[in-house]
Structures are given as C-alpha cells and as structure tokens.
C-alpha cells in the first residue's frame, strides 16, 4: 500500500511541474503575437463520421469531452480501488477525509455565491472553487520530500479522491442539459452490457472498451457530459479476477502516465490561455474572479478545517497517526489548488455564456490556485521537522 502511494506521488510531482509549464506556455501564447495561432489551433474543426454517426467539434471540445473522459476513467478506477481496498475502505479511514471534502466543497461554493448572488449567468459557476486538482496538490506536497508523514499524504490523497467523486456528482446533476431520450436509452443499454460483463466475471478489457466507446458516444449525444462515461466504465471493470490479478489496477497503472504526462498538460494548455491585455483593475475585482479566487484561497481551507474539527470533536472521525492540526491546516490550504478541475467545471458552467465569463473564471482559478499553492507549501514547510528533504 505504502509503495503504491509513493509511486503515485512521485509521478504526480513530475506531472505537477509539467502542468505548470503547460499553463505558462498557454498564457505566453495567448498574450503574444502567437495568440492567433493558439486560438486557431484550438478552434480547428475535427470530424469523425461513420455511417450515420457524425461527431463534428472544434479541437478544444475533443480535448474537454474526449481526453478528459479518459482522465475521469482513471479517477473512477482510483476511487473504486480506494473504496474497496485502500484509504477509504473502512469507516474509520474514510471519515475524516469525507467530512473534510464535504466542507471543502460547500464553503467555497458559498463564498462564490456570496459575490455572485442575484446574477443567474455568473451563479452557474458556483461549483468552480469546489474542486481540487489532485495532481497539483500532491505535486506541491511531494516537493517537501520525506519530511511529510505518509499518513498526511494519504489524508490529502483520500480527501482529493472524495472531492473528485463530489465533482462527478455535481457534473451529473447540474451541468447536463437538453437531454436526448434515444441517446439515454442507448447509454442505458451499454451500461447494462458493462454490468453484465462484470457479473459474468469477464476480465478481458476489450469488450469493456467496445461497450465503453458506445457508451461515450451515447452520453456525448445525450446532453449528459461525456466525461461521466469514463467513471461508469471504471466502476464496471472488475477489481479482482479469480486468479488474483487485477484488471482494474492493471488499466489504472497503464493510464496513469498518459494522464499525468499527456492528458492533463494538454487540457491545461488548451484551457489556461487567458488574454489579459483587455483586463484592468475593475475586471480583476469583478464578482466571478473574486468569488473563485477567494473561494479557493479562503473557502477551501476554512471548509476543510471547520468540518474536520467538528467531526473530530463529535468523535465521528480521528486525526491520522502522527498528525496534528498544525499539519492539517496547511494541507487544507493546498486543497485550494483548483487548476485543471476548476477550469474544467468553468468550461461547463459558462459553455453557452459570453466567452468573457470563461476568461474571468480561468483568471480567478489561476490566481486562487497559485496563492493556495504558495501558502500551502511555505506553511507546511514551516511546521514540518527539518530532516532529510
């Protein structure tokens, strides 16, 4: 278990650096003479036509709907493993990160709505600061090396996974529109097929892949966000085969490098390019970026700490071994690193609104996430013992 966590964290730390490079490159291109090339590249029409099936979208939507579905497949595999065998497999292990994650979603959403109350357009972005970017958060923590107790790393990992699960539910309930009955019926049949494969003990990934592709297309056409197909597929792939092998973990290990070093950097590059040349102080202090930035910088740590404290005081949860509140507090600050997950929700929340709102949301996400990363890193560095960095 500990070896798996260490391998996960080492990969996430490298991935976090690559994400930063992708974000910096996107911002550089969006605010330079290369801006036209950048926007033109993301707007490139890509069409897939097979018989009556016709999917025609700009490249950025293929990234957000297609590549991110694979990312959510990986999240689903991680969540299933942790629920059945890992850090969330018992009530005692799952209680504290669960309460922390709930607080870390509710309070930032409340902060955002406080600044955007009464505006039906901007209110749609309430879930943006509720997300935590697991790659960035774990990557920042990994920079502190062996000074960080494994139990603290497991706490952040479990919290982030529950947060991801919450984001999945939010997307399903609040960001699905114009539902197509026929597509939903096809999706339901595909899900029934996937469940049937699981019940029959099929361990070959090929039939899951075929039905999964059908499910993705059906969900894409249904009005429900296509990334949810990845989660459903993940939950249907068996964790253990009769011979003791794990099809689920095998796929997870295969997908993880692709997600860390390709999918998330590509997503960050495609979505982080905010043109700031036409922005001024009035823009920066408008409700959307302020609500998101403060939701991430203040709402996240306050929500995580308050809900955790209440849970421990009511004896509904307990602190990890060898970890006190002075270590939990900076980790709570790190949970405000929203980056790719917050940007993804922003792309859904303002998909049909003026593009300006998307730019403002990304700007708020960048400011809030960077501040949360800096505060979390230096705070945690200060409270940890100075040994073997």
From Swiss-Prot:
Its main location: membrane. GO terms for cellular component: plasma membrane. GO terms for molecular function: sodium:proton antiporter activity. The keyword Repressor does not apply. The chain crosses the membrane at residues 14-34, 59-79, 95-115, 124-144, 154-174, 177-197, 213-233, 257-277, 292-312, 328-348, 363-383. NCBIfam families: NhaA, PRK09560.1, PRK09561.1. This is Na(+)/H(+) antiporter NhaA. It comes from Shewanella baltica (strain OS185).
